[in-house]
């Protein structure tokens, strides 16, 4: 693993330190200090865990949040909250900050975003840095997308960055590093922004100035609403966040627009940005490859072609980049014909160090811990390989197919499959320690598929389900598992 959060913090530039100060100054303090989650799965090794966190030793359910929404993206822990994006009715979007307090009950949602503020479906797991939450919107069926920056403490908007275009969507997680925000945008390639410099009403302002303006206007809207309620409560319309000005971050660079198709999350390590691009067979667009860019200007440093599409995105493991590939997308009906491979390339020049084919697709990120690469596949197996050589350490018995990434922490691996079975396994040999069936467990009773990988924070495991493929309306759930 090249880039633990502590290593990132020790190597950030002065600019990123100023950026962090701006975020703190621009926002009210949180009740609980949140651990940053600045990229997909929490870090470039894609462990799905807050640094130095341990997961649960048993499958005890602490709380369940039932819903009719479909949770495709993984949950994201953020201090005393867990953030979830979902598809609501008619493919509308929902984004919620849920309290992790087991006693929260019906008041679990601390704040939420929906229409009219969110205009496109959202399947992007957010990134969190200080009081800034960043997530994208749009799916394969939509054109054009918006990158959103909102406040963690209140959910109020900070900024938006729209990217128009056909087959443009932001499905992967953003990455926040060195004072920059980066995200893949489908046919828009990769976009790199400076969220410390915003355009508002034709003028450049910093993040703190923009928030002062937004707070003042939000207060005016609330005051007007309270005044109208006193005059005629039946016709008073609550204020909408969509009525606020929309500051726009400064574009630093954009690479690969019209050449690449970037649906997965990017990884940032040192002065490099690593991304994976797919080739869309139906639309005949994109480039099936792993690509290394220079963080400073987005110029291409190297490119490595691939046999299958790299839906899993990149994982950084020391001086290697690991990528899982699949011949099929996240479509259950296509699973019988899935083929795939894992490819390890040099972080420096993209040269292939090893590659192994498997009779299944790898559609979610590989997790790396203690020199071991752990990944799930559509054949229902969890595999652990040696990072340096690619040799197999262990493989679990086949069960239900997997779309979701594993989470790894403190000698344990946590996985969840398309039948809603959550397992805790030993990292050393893959032996099962505990299992929880979300469909049959008396505390949950919510059958569903898990698309977004489970995540770990402060001894707890969070997992969310979707039922897009269910012929009947079945409740979905966000589930918190922990020993206490």
Model-derived features: positions:
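Enrichment for repetitive, rod-forming helical segments
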Residues: 11, 22-24, 48, 53
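Bacterial N-terminal signal peptides that target proteins for export
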Residues: 2-20
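Helix-centric, low-specificity signal for extended rod-like, repetitive segments
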Residues: 8-10, 26, 376
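Bacterial N-terminal signal peptides
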Residues: 18-29
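Noncatalytic, solvent-exposed loop/strand surfaces
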Residues: 33-484
């Amino acid at each position: 693993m090249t880039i633990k959060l502590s290593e990132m913090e020790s190597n950030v530039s002065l600019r990123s330190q100023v950026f962090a100060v701006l975020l703190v100054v621009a926002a009210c303090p949180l009740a609980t200090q949140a651990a940053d989650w600045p990229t997909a799965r929490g870090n470039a090794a894609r462990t799905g865990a807050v640094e130095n966190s341990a997961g649960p030793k048993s499958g005890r359910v602490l709380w369940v949040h039932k819903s009719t929404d479909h949770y495709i993206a993984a949950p994201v822990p953020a201090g005393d909250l867990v953030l979830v994006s979902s598809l609501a009715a008619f493919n509308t979007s929902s984004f919620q900050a849920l309290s992790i307090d087991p006693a929260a009950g019906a008041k679990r949602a601390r704040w939420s975003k929906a229409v009219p503020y969110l205009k496109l479906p959202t399947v992007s797991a957010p990134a969190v840095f200080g009081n800034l939450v960043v997530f994208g919107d749009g799916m394969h069926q939509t054109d054009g997308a918006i990158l959103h920056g909102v406040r963690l403490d209140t959910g109020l908007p900070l900024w938006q960055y729209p990217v128009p275009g056909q087959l443009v969507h932001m499905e992967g997680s953003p990455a926040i590093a060195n004072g920059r925000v980066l995200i893949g945008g489908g046919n828009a390639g990769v976009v790199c922004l400076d969220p410390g410099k915003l355009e508002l009403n034709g003028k450049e302002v910093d993040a703190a100035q923009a928030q002062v303006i937004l707070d003042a206007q939000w207060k005016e809207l609330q005051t007007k609403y309270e005044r109208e309620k006193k005059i005629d409560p039946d016709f008073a319309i609550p204020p909408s966040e969509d009525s606020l000005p929309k500051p726009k971050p400064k574009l630093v660079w954009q690479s690969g627009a019209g050449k690449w198709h970037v649906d997965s999350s990017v990884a940032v390590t040192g002065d490099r940005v690593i991304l994976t691009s797919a080739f869309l067979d139906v639309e005949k667009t994109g480039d099936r490859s792993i690509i290394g860019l220079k963080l400073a200007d987005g110029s291409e440093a190297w490119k490595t072609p691939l046999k299958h599409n790299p839906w899993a995105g990149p994982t950084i493991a020391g001086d290697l980049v690991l990528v899982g590939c699949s011949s099929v997308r996240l479509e259950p009906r296509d699973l019988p014909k899935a083929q795939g491979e894992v490819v390890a390339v040099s972080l420096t020049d993209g040269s292939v160090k090893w590659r192994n084919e498997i009779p299944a697709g790898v559609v979610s990120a590989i997790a790396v811990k203690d020199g071991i690469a752990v990944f799930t596949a559509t054949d229902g197996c969890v595999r652990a390989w040696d990072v340096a050589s690619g040799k197999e350490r262990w493989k679990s018995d086949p069960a239900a197919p997997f779309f979701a990434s594993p989470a790894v922490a403190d000698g344990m691996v946590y996985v969840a499959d398309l039948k809603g079975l959550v397992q805790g396994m030993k990292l050393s040999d893959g032996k099962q320690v505990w299992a929880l069936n979300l469909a049959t467990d008396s505390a949950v009773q919510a059958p569903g598929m898990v698309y977004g990988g489970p995540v770990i924070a402060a001894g707890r495991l969070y997992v969310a389900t979707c039922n897009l493929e269910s012929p009947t309306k079945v409740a979905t759930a966000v589930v918190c598992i922990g020993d206490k």
